[in-house]
């Protein structure tokens, strides 16, 4: 994926002129979005190679009090792309969601003995929420967050079997395991991409591209979707916290992907989370 372009990089520095030449094979395609950017542009195509040029002049000097939402920037993304042997297109969010789903296909199988263990844990429970709660708490008690990303591992999850054996995984791996556990319980759920971080800006919803850095699990219910932060050992099911709340996320399915938004939490509606820790 492509880096964004920020023509202003430092505080108290005058930018008299800055330009970007972006050269790419024409058949890959290019999507872009100019944000607060008034640039002179030029496009040239020669022998199947396209060069797009943006040039800005006499930009405002940044100070510490500068409104970051007014910062000029250029967002870039390919239409066609490949990572490893997996090719995809980002004409729309559905295309990116389908690519992510294909990337993780076949990596959720659980051994028969563990499937039986799951069924035993939920055999006396009546409602889907009760089953979600028990399995989520099992995940929180027995697995820990460790991020190891080799090769395509920055995008593709570890297998559920590997997480079971190692007792750890990153956000992708823990989410994939939780999804697989719920599937055994007969509860559908969706691997969901999000740009996480406290007080982070929302993604650009009109530029379908990989703007994400984290994964959560979304579980549809009759009363609305439940979000599971599978790297947390404390959150109750359905509570995401300010790390991923109130922002657009990409829900992925084998048929494609679609955007939805995580809940916003108002201070006067907050619940307390009380924990008791014994250290010996």
Give the predicted meaning of each segment.
Residues 132-134, 138-140, 158-169, 174-189:
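Active-site-proximal cofactor/substrate-binding loop regions of enzyme domains
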Residues 259-264, 268-279:
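Long, His/Glu/Asp-enriched segments that create or flank divalent metal/ion-associated functional microenvironments
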Residues 15-17, 49, 212-214, 246-247, ...:
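Extracytoplasmic
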Residues 112-116, 144-167, 197:
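Short, conserved helix/loop micro-motifs enriched in His/Cys and acidic residues
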Residues 13-14, 111, 128, 132, ...:
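Active-site-proximal structural scaffolding
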Residues 1-148, 280:
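Secretory-pathway-linked proteins and extracytosolic
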Residues 102, 122, 146-150, 158, ...:
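Active-site-adjacent structural elements in folded domains
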Residues 173-264:
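Hydrophobic/aromatic-rich core segments of domains that either
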